Amino acid sequence: MDLETGEVSADSLQEGEGFVEDNLPTNGNSDTTENNIIDPFGDIFKPTQWVGNTPVRWSTCGTHPTEHPCNFVLLDQNGEEFQLYDHYDKAIVVDFSAGWCGPCRRAADVVQEHSDTFAGDGLLYVTVLIETATGEDPTVADLQAWADDHNITSAPVLAGSRALLESGGGDWALTGWPTFYFIKKEMDMHITMRGWSEEMLVELIEEILE
């Protein structure tokens, strides 16, 4: 990896200068019955989108470029359900963060700024908080505190858990914090960025808006 640019040639991964390796044990609270995740291994995770009144299902989903991301339904900081596939026609940044991760907190400080800057172009910036600062699954109150601490006023902050991640039996690959997925408006994966680089974030947002 080139530490100056953060570029990695393997499997279209971009890597920022600052990240935290995900080598911590799970906290033991990421049970698949956790209320933060609604039916995590049922139909809600099957790839579904609507064209008019017609449901469309993809036979596979994944995290590699050109694949369709796997759907999720999670609670946001207002206690309302957020479903990824409801936003089929938007370019989406999905930011997987943890409360104990320093680079994640630095990234969170500019979420609302970039969300506002690119909102008119059709960008949706989504934070999925996997763990709190103490390693617990986040509650709605934790999401509200995260949003308040980082001046996030409208961008969704969602309650995740390790059940979402491949290491916990889920579909989303994560080996370091934060990890960002960049998704095009057609709900196609574009690229992944591990670690924090604001310059690279903006460049990749512009790419998915092209």
Labelled PLM ranges:
Residues 89-91, 106-129:
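Conserved helix-turn-beta segment immediately C-terminal to the redox Cys motif
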Residues 96-113, 135:
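Conserved redox-active cysteine motifs that mediate thiol-disulfide chemistry
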